[in-house]
Amino acid sequence: MYNCAIILAAGKGKRMKSSMPKVVHKVCGKEMINHVIDNVRKANIKDVNLVIGKGSETVKEHTKDRNVTYSMQEEQLGTGHAVICAEEFLKDKKGTVAIFTGDAPLITNETIQELFEFHNSGKYAATLISSTVQDPTGYGRIIREASGVVKKIVEHKDCNEEELKVNEINSGMYCFDIEVLLNSLENLNNDNSQGEYYLTDVIEIIKKSGEKVGAIVVPYEEIMGVNSRVQLSEAEIVMRKRINHKHMVNGVTFIDCESTYIDVDVEIGNDTIIYPGCVIQGNTTIKEECTLYSNSRICNSVIGSGVIVENSVILESHVGEGTTVGPFAYIRPETKIGKSARIGDFVEIKKSTIGDNTKVSHLTYIGDAEVGSKCNFGCGTVVVNYDGQKKQKTIIGNNAFIGCNTNLISPVKVNDNTYIAAGSTITKEVPEGSLAIARSKQINKEGWLDKKGLLKK
């Protein structure tokens, strides 16, 4: 059986009060439209078409790696009109098409699979997703026949007294037999107060033709649409609970899961402990037995097993197993730190490689450098990598000891097994086995304070 999907993503999203299309706003690190696309794909649906309109180029930019096709809806004349705009996508296809909304990011791949299976096994012409809620005010009601088969969808404003008591609501997401849908769209009109073409009217057209219409009922959170910043926040809360629950089931300890913020594509190994206030973003991978103390942020990075991070920021970097980072360290993009290293407090590292067992314990800046293994950096060391026009490279070999308050003026090379005396400013290569001293000779002027009248008696 051929299955495909159309995702409606042309809405303006006026209530978002944003210059961006509504569907590219993110929930737990991923655009709403990409949540829907990815879950459709997890349900083994290969052909996906997006109906786009306002901000179409922005939507295309955010979905360019998703291997989807696009249909344009120049004017927003209702959900039925949006599907009419995708008729070219459906042309000459036979099978089943599902229609989803790009602003409902909480729909799961399990529900999508269930929708297709229910629709195809029951040989329905149309199947819709519904939900039951305590307060259905404002929603279209699902009216069923005594047998349980869907009879019609009635908008709230058109409900009679009995229909208002129904608490099963329409989600705006459907499955259709493609041929039946295309035939029904030919009979769709905009004879209503809004002058729009409603997809809900297609259900009534199908019923009148004698075809079967079914429905599956899912939890409300799965069909919740996002039309405002308030609803965006509500969706974020639901998604975050799902993400954290998944990690806890897989063996991750959260000291306080409600104050831990993890993006949807993050991977975390078992026996890792995460303290409150941590933010883990993007395509980050954290391996087994790590400890992330409070107020740490890690984005698009790989953290090896047994790493300890405390009150630190790690961006687009790799940290080797057994390394400790922080407190208050700043690991900037394109940094690779080896195994069992020590990156201490108020250390900033940018676009550099740090070898195994190297210690950079405090108050140090390293930029555009290659540092070997078993090195030790004293407090206050600075790699001076910028000459006013471009960044220069520093190379430090294995077993180098860098004394406190050393300036390494790039480009410069410090070879294996070297010592640099505290307070030195190094501008030339330091040979292997050498001690480098580059500082002014100390001069003591005896009696100077007395001569200047500054000596307190």
From Swiss-Prot:
Q: Which GO terms describe its cellular component?
A: cytoplasm; membrane
A GO BP entry is: cell wall organization
List residues binding acetyl-CoA. Answer: 385-386, 422, 439
Superkingdom of this protein's organism: Bacteria
Localization, UniProt: Cytoplasm
Cofactor binding remark? Binds 1 Mg(2+) ion per subunit.
Q: What positions does UniProt annotate as the active site of this protein?
A: 362 (proton acceptor)
Q: Would the keyword Membrane be found if you checked this record's keyword annotation?
A: no
Pathway annotation = Nucleotide-sugar biosynthesis; UDP-N-acetyl-alpha-D-glucosamine biosynthesis; N-acetyl-alpha-D-glucosamine 1-phosphate from alpha-D-glucosamine 6-phosphate (route II): step 2/2; Nucleotide-sugar biosynthesis; UDP-N-acetyl-alpha-D-glucosamine biosynthesis; UDP-N-acetyl-alpha-D-glucosamine from N-acetyl-alpha-D-glucosamine 1-phosphate: step 1/1; Bacterial outer membrane biogenesis; LPS lipid A biosynthesis
Q: Which reaction does it catalyse?
A: alpha-D-glucosamine 1-phosphate + acetyl-CoA = N-acetyl-alpha-D-glucosamine 1-phosphate + CoA + H(+); N-acetyl-alpha-D-glucosamine 1-phosphate + UTP + H(+) = UDP-N-acetyl-alpha-D-glucosamine + diphosphate
Linker: annotated segments: 230-250
EC nos? 2.7.7.23, 2.3.1.157
The EC category is transferase
Q: What are the start and end residues of every segment in region (Pyrophosphorylase)?
A: 1-229
The record's listing under Pfam families reads: Hexapep, NTP_transferase
| GO terms assigned for molecular function | glucosamine-1-phosphate N-acetyltransferase activity; magnesium ion binding; UDP-N-acetylglucosamine diphosphorylase activity
Binding of Mg(2+), residues: 103, 227
Q: Which residue intervals make up region (N-acetyltransferase)?
A: 251-457
Q: Which UniProt keywords apply?
A: Acyltransferase, Cell shape, Cell wall biogenesis/degradation, Cytoplasm, Magnesium, Metal-binding, Multifunctional enzyme, Nucleotidyltransferase, Peptidoglycan synthesis, Repeat, Transferase
Q: Return the NCBIfam families for the record.
A: glmU, PRK14354.1
Subunit field text = Homotrimer.
- Main function: Catalyzes the last two sequential reactions in the de novo biosynthetic pathway for UDP-N-acetylglucosamine (UDP-GlcNAc). The C-terminal domain catalyzes the transfer of acetyl group from acetyl coenzyme A to glucosamine-1-phosphate (GlcN-1-P) to produce N-acetylglucosamine-1-phosphate (GlcNAc-1-P), which is converted into UDP-GlcNAc by the transfer of uridine 5-monophosphate (from uridine 5-triphosphate), a reaction catalyzed by the N-terminal domain.
- Return the PANTHER family for the record: BIFUNCTIONAL PROTEIN GLMU (PTHR43584:SF3), NUCLEOTIDYL TRANSFERASE (PTHR43584)
Q: Which family does it belong to?
A: In the N-terminal section; belongs to the N-acetylglucosamine-1-phosphate uridyltransferase family.
What is the protein name stated in its UniProt record?
A: Bifunctional protein GlmU
Q: Which organism is it from?
A: Clostridium botulinum (strain 657 / Type Ba4)
Gene label = glmU
